[in-house]
């Protein structure tokens, strides 16, 4: 693997993307669950 070209390592991109997806999905499900709980 060549580490030239100054690009961000793929594992860093994958980690940040994974954390972002988990955070967004978690907030979405928490918001939906809280909304359902308050409406019932």
UniProtKB/Swiss-Prot annotation:
One of its GO terms (biological process) is photosynthesis. Gene3D superfamilies: 6.10.250.2070. It is a single-pass membrane protein. InterPro entries: PSII_PsbJ, PSII_PsbJ_sf. One of its GO terms (cellular component) is photosystem II reaction center. Keywords: Membrane, Photosynthesis, Photosystem II, Reaction center, Thylakoid, Transmembrane, Transmembrane helix. The chain crosses the membrane at residues 8-28. Pfam families: PsbJ. It is found in: Cellular thylakoid membrane. One of the components of the core complex of photosystem II (PSII). PSII is a light-driven water:plastoquinone oxidoreductase that uses light energy to abstract electrons from H(2)O, generating O(2) and a proton gradient subsequently used for ATP formation. It consists of a core antenna complex that captures photons, and an electron transfer chain that converts photonic excitation into a charge separation. Belongs to the PsbJ family. PSII is composed of 1 copy each of membrane proteins PsbA, PsbB, PsbC, PsbD, PsbE, PsbF, PsbH, PsbI, PsbJ, PsbK, PsbL, PsbM, PsbT, PsbX, PsbY, PsbZ, Psb30/Ycf12, peripheral proteins PsbO, CyanoQ (PsbQ), PsbU, PsbV and a large number of cofactors. It forms dimeric complexes. This is Photosystem II reaction center protein J. The gene is psbJ.
